[in-house]
């Protein structure tokens, strides 16, 4: 979610996604992370949680302001990623109208990985070669410094403009426009693959420019009526473009696939107080997606083109999700109850103009409906303690990526499956939070445990066609995979955090999260389950100086805990899996007057080599970070 608009669209993939980088972090006001199924409020896909990005709003001129113009400039350099980021935003304020404009440009270069291989695998993750195309010939070149991951750099521009209209004392309107576009981005995990002849499998494997355009109008009012006390309505249009460019080593044929997605959305939410201690929230939501997927092959010798199989149905595809929902909040003494229900109707269809695979039909049309609900209980024994119990259901209706995708990764070919049904989650969560003040020490902790049953869970599994698990496609044999509804999945875990503040200027914070997931009957591990991870932070402020020491860590993820197929990127892991790692970062900041803050950081202090779980690229090694923030 971003500013009340769903980012999930018809071609969102399950698992590891990069779409969040299209939201400019320099213009964020907050980021809400909601754990557990949240289908009542957010609908399909909110099966495990919700991330809601909220960008800054323009500010109106008030009586204490001396100027109607204000702004901020930020710049940052990072040595390990060769990053140079620049951001500027400025606010124009009036009594009833205000505008906020933001511009961010980020450029990244080659990435230096850590050299301290505490995991013991001396060659794991090294970038040993790269390819050069010259005079219509590919050449495999040895990397003179295999710790430098060449060619992974990219640049990106993010633009945001929001205009706020104060309609009256109780109502306002915000027009929100956001645009993000990147350069080409290399897939190093594909470019480092070798064939049986020890030659590169690909000479080119790029994501093309990733574009996201959002335009929305948000109206809110607190003018009471019989039906509501507060109303918020958001109407939006999004345009998303993704593309992929691939060429095999020593081939003159470059494959290009382009996906264009348009999304129309509306969400109307109303709130009505009932008496002094209860409130009713209700509303409706509609999202309509269209997908135009095209692919062509470019002959580099004569620049001729020909049509090839597209990633998604080449005759077009769409999804339609209308829903109604309501929740009731009751507060009485030390107890708070929240119950909700949502009904969603889902429709997905696609057309294959030419049967790209013999066993495919001409298309598909799926119609489903889902009923989900939640019941949460909050108990406050005193002012500093909260205990909560949450029972909820969630669902995820198959989208076009689940139903109609054809793509190659490693030695696997994923084929469409139009027989999928929605997967459902039944969740139980129990948690407690506590705050304690003792003289000059403030202590707080929170802990949450969860247990989720997934029914008809969608997983990628092997498939046989005409009695064979292999298929000849694109001049090669591949193992066949397809998204399928499997048995019941069990996901459970525990998360917690502790914060301690000493003498108001020394603060310690720690958090930890553990998750496991398996299919109930076969005991096969589920995909995309991260290992144990956490962080330790120590922050000290002295006058205008701020010192930070940060420790991030991950436990190991061994091979036998990987999901089926290649979803957890087993080819990018070490022989044992993904080793555990920990890194220490340090940072010091200096506040010069009120308008200028300078920061200097040393990240990955001990130059540790590691990969985050399922990553196709090694993380940056020791790096120097310098930044400056100027307010005006």
Predicted regions and their residues:
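N-terminal periplasmic accessory domains that precede
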Residues: 1, 17-21, 33, 46-72, ...
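Short acidic/polar hinge/loop motifs at secondary-structure boundaries
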Residues: 7-37
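Surface-exposed extracellular loop regions of Gram-negative outer-membrane beta-barrel proteins
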Residues: 10, 181-183, 239-243, 297-298, ...
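Outer-membrane beta-barrel signature, preferentially recognizing the C-terminal barrel domain
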Residues: 65, 79, 201-224, 313-319, ...
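Transmembrane beta-barrel wall of Gram-negative outer-membrane proteins
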Residues: 81-108, 118-184, 211-213, 275-276, ...
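Flexible loop and strand-edge segments within Gram-negative outer membrane beta-barrel domains
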Residues: 150-156, 166, 170-228, 239-261, ...
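Gram-negative outer-membrane beta-barrel transporters
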Residues: 276, 331-333, 346, 444-453, ...
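Signature of Gram-negative outer-membrane beta-barrel scaffolds
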Residues: 279-385, 397
């Amino acid at each position: 979610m971003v500013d009340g608009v769903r980012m999930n669209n018809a071609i969102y993939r399950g698992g590891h996604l990069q779409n969040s980088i299209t939201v400019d972090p320099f213009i964020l006001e907050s980021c809400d992370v909601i754990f557990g199924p949240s289908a009542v409020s957010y609908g399909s896909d909110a099966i495990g949680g919700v991330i809601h990005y909220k960008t800054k709003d323009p500010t109106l001129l008030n009586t204490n302001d001396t100027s109607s113009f204000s702004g901020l400039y930020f710049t940052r350099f990072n040595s390990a990623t060769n990053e140079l980021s620049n951001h500027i935003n400025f606010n124009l304020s009036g009594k009833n109208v205000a505008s906020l404009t933001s511009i961010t440009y980020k450029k990244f270069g080659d990435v230096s990985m850590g050299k301290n291989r505490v995991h013991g695998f001396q060659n794991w993750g090294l970038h040993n070669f790269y390819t050069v195309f010259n005079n219509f010939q590919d050449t495999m070149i040895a990397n003179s410094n295999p710790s430098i991951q060449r060619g992974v750099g990219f640049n990106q521009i993010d633009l945001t403009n929001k205009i706020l209209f104060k309609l009256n004392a109780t109502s306002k309107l915000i027009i929100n426009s956001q645009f993000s576009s990147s350069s080409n981005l290399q897939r190093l995990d594909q470019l480092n693959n070798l064939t049986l002849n020890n030659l590169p499998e690909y000479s080119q494997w790029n994501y093309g420019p990733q574009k996201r355009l959002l335009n929305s109008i948000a109206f809110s009012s607190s003018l009471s009526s019989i039906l509501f006390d507060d109303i918020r309505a958001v109407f939006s249009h999004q345009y998303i473009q993704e593309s992929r460019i691939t060429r095999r080593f020593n081939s003159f044929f470059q494959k290009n696939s382009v996906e264009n997605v348009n999304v129309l959305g509306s969400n109307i939410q109303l709130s009505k107080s009932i008496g002094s201690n209860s409130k009713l929230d209700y509303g409706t939501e509609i999202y309509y997606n269209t997908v135009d997927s095209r692919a062509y092959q470019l002959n580099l010798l004569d620049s001729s083109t020909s049509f090839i199989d597209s990633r998604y149905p080449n005759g077009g595809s769409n999804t339609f999700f209308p829903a109604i929902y309501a929740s009731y909040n009751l507060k009485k003494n030390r107890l708070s109850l929240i119950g909700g229900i949502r009904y969603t109707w889902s429709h997905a269809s696609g057309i294959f103009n030419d049967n790209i695979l013999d066993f495919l039909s001409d298309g598909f049309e799926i119609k489903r409906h889902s009923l989900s609900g939640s019941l949460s209980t909050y108990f406050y024994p005193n002012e500093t303690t909260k205990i909560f119990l949450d029972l909820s259901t969630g669902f995820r209706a198959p989208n076009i990526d689940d139903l109609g995708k054809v793509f190659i990764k490693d030695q696997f070919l994923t084929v469409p499956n139009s027989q999928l049904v929605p997967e459902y989650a039944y969740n139980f969560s129990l948690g407690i939070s506590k705050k304690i003040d003792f003289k000059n020490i403030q202590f707080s902790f929170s802990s949450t445990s969860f247990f989720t049953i997934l029914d008809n869970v969608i997983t990628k599994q092997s498939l046989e066609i005409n009695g064979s698990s292999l298929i000849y496609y694109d001049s090669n044999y591949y193992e066949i995979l397809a998204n399928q509804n499997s048995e019941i999945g069990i996901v459970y875990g525990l998360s917690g955090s502790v914060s301690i503040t000493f003498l108001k200027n020394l603060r310690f914070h720690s958090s930890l999260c553990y998750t496991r997931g398996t299919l109930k009957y076969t005991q096969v591990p589920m995909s995309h389950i991260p290992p144990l991870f956490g962080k330790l932070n120590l922050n000290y402020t002295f006058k205008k100086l701020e010192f930070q020491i940060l420790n991030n860590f991950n436990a190991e993820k061994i091979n036998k805990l990987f999901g089926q197929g290649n979803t957890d990127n087993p080819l990018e892991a070490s022989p044992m899996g993904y080793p555990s790692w920990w890194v220490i970062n340090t940072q010091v900041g200096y506040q010069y007057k009120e308008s200028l803050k300078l920061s200097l950081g040393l990240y990955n202090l001990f130059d540790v080599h590691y990969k985050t779980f399922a990553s196709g690229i090694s993380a940056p090694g020791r790096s120097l970070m310098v930044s400056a923030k100027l307010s005006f």
